[in-house]
Amino acid sequence: LDPAVHIRRIFDATRDVTLLIDEAHHLPERIRDMLSGSVDSAGLRKLRTVVGKAAGKKHPLYKAMTDVIRAVDNLLLPEDGSQEGTLPKLPDDFDRVCVSLADAFMDARQEHFPWEDAGGRLGDTLMPLLSFNRARQRDSADYAILWEGRRHPKITAFALDSAGYFQQATQGLSGVTCFSATLHPLPEMRLLLGGAEDDACFAMPSPFPPEHLQIRQVDVNTRYAHRSSACTEIVRQITALVTRKPGKYLVFFPSFAFLRMTAERLMLPCQVQEKQMDEAARAAFLDAYRQDGGDALSLCVLGGVFSEGIDLPGRQLDGVVVVGVGLPQVNLYQEVLRAHFERTLGDGFLYAYMLPGMQKVTQAVGRVIRTETDTGVALLLDDRYSYPAYRRLMPEHWRVTR
């Protein structure tokens, strides 16, 4: 599906091909990432310095960078003092200088670089630029132009219509099957994936007995303005859980800041997820769970590497605690998406915030029961879990008590 690595023998063939997509709940966001691109003025300035020192200011790449930097600097940004926002359009010559820079990049990559440090940086800067140029060739109605940073702005062509692209990219195939444990609720997910009303939707029952997972909800106000005061109750709930039933637990937080705030007050031995963890560090982090016997308590970030894709069957994991409802951080990108979904689907908050949040919650809770014989607990700490709007986003087999 990625236009940069399009598999022509599949998508351009006339023969029968059926596409199977696992973990399809990630697809809308992945498509948006693939179709979006950016021009980073600050990054270009740093790289231009390296290129200038190594190859001289007369080098074609240096000149092409200067043209793009000048074009970004000449953009008419709002005079309200804001540090980010959207632009209705870009000047006519903006695309031309960006294409010229991409050509200069490609020519430079064919050279035997006299500068070692620039090699990797060229690739890091080139790929978003190529994506930006591809984005600008598509229908402008499918994109929003965003700017970030007033002094040296970053300009992003942000893809909005992932459903339309997915539908167009797969229309020549004989069939597409999307599946995931978190494609719920199906009507909303079908819209996000560009499905038609007559497309078949199936919700399979959980293969695991629902009584094997005890889910309890506690009313805690975890909204940003109340997080400091919420820490006291969160610490109390975690302590009560691991004291009442010692074992191996994962606790998930909506952000690293909230995680650290709670860790400072939690008087229990525990591991804390770090922002940057290589494969060896991740494996070491999970060793406490994969060893026979003993207890383990770890504080992690919801939606991170430890809330999806890890398998801890049997007594390797006794339960999880989820703090908050997983709403994405409010930022320029999410607010632009919210406005887009409000226009196209009628409920921007549901599609931009609630659905992605509850998908992360469902994935985290799904770490507990991995086989037919597993048993465990999940503790949901947020008052919004009792709201009907959030209840309908929970898997049908969940039995939540208070």
What positions do the PLM features span?
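Conserved coupling segment at the C-terminus of the helicase ATP-binding
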Residues: 4-250, 254-266
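Conserved RecA-like helicase motor-core motifs
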Residues: 198-203, 267-286
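Conserved RecA-like P-loop NTPase helicase motor core
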Residues: 219-229, 275-385
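Short His-Asn-centered micro-motif
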Residues: 1, 21, 158, 179-181, ...
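Short, solvent-exposed amphipathic alpha-helical segments in soluble enzyme
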Residues: 191-196, 265-267, 313-317, 337-338, ...
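A glycine-rich phosphate-binding loop feature that marks nucleotide/adenosyl-phosphate handling sites
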Residues: 254-262, 378-387
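N-terminal targeting/trafficking signals and adjacent low-complexity tails
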Residues: 349, 379-402
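Switch/connector loops and helix/strand junctions flanking conserved nucleotide-binding motifs
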Residues: 27-30, 185-192, 259-261, 307-311, ...
